[in-house]
Amino acid sequence: MKFSKFYAISTKENPKDATLPSHIFLVKGAFIEQIGSGLYNFLPLGKRVLDKIKNIIKEEMDKAGALEVNLSFNTPAELWKESGRFNVFGKELLRFKDRKENDFVLGPTHEEAMVALIRNKITSYKQLPLHLYQIGLKFRDEARPRFGLLRCREFLMKDGYSFHASEADLDKEFNLMHETYSKILTRLGLDFRAVEADSGAIGGSGSKEFMVLAKNGEDDILLCEHCDYAANIEAAKRTKKTCTDERPEADFATQFHTPNVKTIEELAEFFKINPYYTIKAIAKKAIYESEEKIIVFFIRGDDELQEVKALNAANALELVDVSEEELEKAGLVPGFIGFVGLNGVDFYIDHELENETNMIIGANKKDYHLVGINVVNLNKERFKDLAAVKEHDLCPKCQHKLKQSKGIEVGHIFKLGKKYSQAMNASYLDENGKAQFFTMGCYGMGVSRLVAVAIEASHDEKGCIWNKTLAPFVLDIIVSNIKDIKAMEFAEQIYTHFKDKEILFDDRNERFGVKINDFELMGFPYALVIGKSLENDEVELIHRNTLEKQVLKTQEVISHLEKIL
């Protein structure tokens, strides 16, 4: 492709409100342009990258036996009402009416549409398993779109849905998709980890996220460098904490006067003990579809509450902070809340506290704590995983220290189970002729997001650094002076020889500095610079990842390029 015939007009100014390198460089480098809040056009350079990603995803999904479909971007609201998500999904779900007052949604995901597609058509276990996928537009009405392609409102996504007759068969497909996603990201040249994750609004269990490691990542992940354990901080687990400091000794539930001792730090100082032996109470207001109520979460004093874990324990739509006035109205004593004798309020206790002895906790009485509490003989349903796992906590698999890192989610696979098939009455006949609901899996990958992620993972202060797999062009032929006939003839010779490759011939009537700046900004892997040194039968090859300049003799240019392109 000759640059003079190509549409790629770079800009010098950073886009407004852009903070991430991928957002800045993709806009300045003419890969994308913003047309509205969270809405982007893909320009020819960006479209070439996007198509490469799509093709690799399609190749690997097809190899895995999945079948490609293309579902409508619009989904009748009746399907979302069947699943129960229409009223609970939140404002991110864009709802609208057509001219006949029929309700529709712009799909952020397509579980409902896929179930409707196979419902009453797949009727026998003999037709299972079945895996359908699509690569298409999705829409989420984000309250604060930001970070360019990483958090926009309209995006391209690969979403797949599998249907099975048993959990065991779903497990096989889940493992196959784990392997397939790993192959895709490896082919894309990205440094990634598959991490344990929370299922979020989609629901289900058996959830893994695929995270590309990047210092500007929006997600915190915990990794073990001694085994394969990795988890999103929202779902991370650890080996149970221990402490060798002396425990507080007292008869069971001895009441101590602790005037104005409201915080864990004050409590530990008052009793001269390690906060490990105290129990912290965090009260939240849980928001449900038709009610609100206060729930108290109890964790070890030196831990922090993990909000997503708490949300899952409460099975609520949202958890919000609660005022002291609201606590007092509910009969609670701020700063002195404990679960002993706590009535009329739901509460959960971190599972690591089960069977602990000689602990200190609030007495539900102003200025009093209980010492010598044994966390025993409580309903098992009270105990949930609530504490946030931190760096240097011990790996749940091998007991080595965990390391915290930053990552960007690019894929997510779920075991949905029967959540959607049961809600939408989608069933088949098993080998005994009995109706059974489909067991489902769900597999998503952010296609347009991967364009930005690749640059977050690989850039410098000058611009993008594409690997050869993703680069829109692998080589940029730059003639420093297009009026130099010999230089243009040599460039044309190289261009013609490699015309079947992804070559960009910068034949524009622009200053040399403009061409080099565009090469560095757009980030093609190599540039072949043909300038004054051609008089000495020499040209210069620039490696974009290091900006190293390599002098080549003209007679060796073709053979050298054949090796690297």
Curated annotation (Swiss-Prot):
This is Proline--tRNA ligase. Keywords: Aminoacyl-tRNA synthetase, ATP-binding, Cytoplasm, Ligase, Nucleotide-binding, Protein biosynthesis. PANTHER family: MITOCHONDRIAL RIBOSOME PROTEIN L39/PROLYL-TRNA LIGASE FAMILY MEMBER, PROLINE--TRNA LIGASE. It comes from Campylobacter lari (strain RM2100 / D67 / ATCC BAA-1060). Belongs to the class-II aminoacyl-tRNA synthetase family. ProS type 1 subfamily. One of its GO terms (molecular function) is proline-tRNA ligase activity. It holds the Pfam family tRNA-synt_2b. Consists of three domains: the N-terminal catalytic domain, the editing domain and the C-terminal anticodon-binding domain.
